[in-house]
Curated annotation (Swiss-Prot):
Subcellular location: Vacuole membrane; Cell projection, Cilium
Membrane topology recorded in Swiss-Prot or TrEMBL: Multi-pass membrane protein
Pfam families referenced in this protein's UniProt entry, alphabetically: TMEM138 (PF14935)
Keywords tagged on the record: Cell projection, Cilium, Cilium biogenesis/degradation, Glycoprotein, Membrane, Transmembrane, Transmembrane helix, Vacuole
Transmembrane segments: 7-27, 39-59, 80-100, 110-130
Gene Ontology BP term (one): cilium assembly
Disruption phenotype: Ciliary phenotypes such as pericardial effusion, curved or kinked tail, as well as gastrulation defects.
Protein family membership: Belongs to the TMEM138 family.
Protein role: Required for ciliogenesis.
Recorded GO CC terms: cilium; vacuolar membrane
Principal cellular location given in the protein's record: membrane
Protein name: Transmembrane protein 138
Organism of derivation: Danio rerio (Zebrafish)
Gene designation: tmem138
Glycosylated residues in this chain: 6
Length: 162
């Protein structure tokens, strides 16, 4: 079971990773003259997104709902967040690779092609949705009802067995 102290620590780590992600999304263009630093920030950002997904999955695996075998209930509840996380990670990696590829040798040259601008917009829209769904999922996974036996869980288990 996820204890209050542990949940607070996990929540703090998750929010720190989300804050760093938001920081990189907001200010990475200011570092276009230093491509190595920008590359390192992009790599750390992508690893942070991956860590956030791993943390959410570990929190899901820790629930009583998962342990009694109602994985479909969890997947139904968190499908949007899992899909958005994968989409956001994919869009971020694609955007980072494309920007660094265009900007590596000539960092002060205008590199914003039409395709890159479209990818940028989709990546930022996915980022906003990712932040919202991730925070909502994190708060929902803090619900103590997910970590203990309860009547609604017994009803869900009975429906799943039929």
């Amino acid at each position: 079971m996820l204890q209050t102290n542990n949940y607070s620590l996990v929540l703090l780590i998750q929010l720190a990773l989300l804050t760093f992600d938001l920081f990189v999304n907001s200010f990475s263009e200011l570092l276009r003259s230093a491509p190595v630093i920008q590359l390192v920030l992009f790599i750390i950002q992508d690893i942070g997104i991956l860590f956030n997904v791993i943390i959410i999955l570990l929190m899901m695996f820790n629930t009583y709902v998962f342990q009694v075998g109602l994985v479909s209930l969890l997947l139904e509840r968190f499908r949007a967040m899992l899909i958005l996380s994968a989409l956001y990670l994919t869009l971020s990696i694609c955007f980072h690779c494309w920007v660094m590829n265009l900007r590596w040798m000539e960092s002060n040259r205008f590199v914003w092609t039409d395709g890159l601008q479209v990818l940028f917009v989709f990546q930022r829209i996915a980022a906003v949705l990712y932040y919202y769904f991730y925070k909502r999922t994190t708060e929902y996974l803090g619900d103590p009802r997910l970590y203990e036996d309860s009547p609604w869980l017994r009803d869900a288990f009975a429906r799943a067995r039929q």
